[in-house]
Amino acid sequence: MESANIFGSDEDCRSCESGWTMYLASQSHDRDDDCYYGDDDEEEEDSDGGDSMDSDASSGPMEATSYLKLAQEIEEQNSIKKKKKKTNEEMVLVETTRVHNNINHDDDDDDDEDDGDNHDYDDGNDSYSVVHSYVGSVRQKGLV
């Protein structure tokens, strides 16, 4: 269609109100007016091949169908979300070990009881250290 046949541009017809359906004029329906509306008092033939434009309201999908999903799609989305969450979580394994530190304040080996029993008994001078082993990645807050 030639640009000369399209009426209703800002230069040709400034009185056309927005929101109204404007018709494109073909050479077979030349009129004196630059633009016209479908609400004329004259009876016009309605034909599918005519100059009228289809309404935009029927061209898009219904809103209700855009929210409908198949069960398989929902399952796939949940699986992807779980994988992302798992990779973002801190993967830390903590192993706690007690290390026995036998502290003898007596440098001399005075064995008051020499009955052949060489077991270490808790004399109150022993201390224990706790050792933590971290395995995996530790994510610091605020850096992601």
From Swiss-Prot:
Biased composition, Acidic residues: where in the chain?
35-54, 106-117
Cysteine pairs bridged by disulfides in the record? none
One GO term (biological process): cytokinin-activated signaling pathway
Family named by the database record: Belongs to the SOFL plant protein family.
Gene for this chain: SOB5
> What topology does it adopt in the membrane?
Peripheral membrane protein
| Alphabetical keyword list | Cell membrane, Cytokinin biosynthesis, Cytokinin signaling pathway, Cytoplasm, Membrane, Nucleus
**According to its UniProt record, where is this protein located?**
Cytoplasm; Cell membrane; Nucleus
What is this protein's tissue specificity according to the annotation?
Expressed in vegetative tissues (hydathodes and trichomes of leaves, shoot meristems and roots) as well as in floral tissues (pistil tips, developing anthers and sepal vasculature) with higher levels in young and developing tissues than in mature ones. Expressed in seedlings, leaves, flowers and siliques, but not in roots.
Intervals of motif SOFL-B: 52-61
- Report the protein name in the record: Protein SUPPRESSOR OF PHYTOCHROME B 5
Task: Tell me where the signal peptide lies.
Answer: none
User: What are its GO cellular component terms?
Assistant: cytoplasm; nucleus; plasma membrane
Where the record places motif SOFL-A is: 18-23
**Known role:** Involved in cytokinin-mediated development. Promotes the expression of cytokinin synthases (e.g. IPT3 and IPT7), thus triggering the accumulation of trans-zeatin riboside, trans-zeatin riboside monophosphate and isopentenyladenine 9-glucoside.
Annotated spans, Disordered: 27-130
Instruction: State the species of origin.
Output: Arabidopsis thaliana (Mouse-ear cress)
Q: Is RNA-binding included in the keywords of this UniProt record?
A: no
Q: What happens when the gene is disrupted?
A: No obvious phenotypes.
Domain characteristics, as noted in the entry: Domains SOFL-A and SOFL-B are required for function in cytokinin-mediated development.
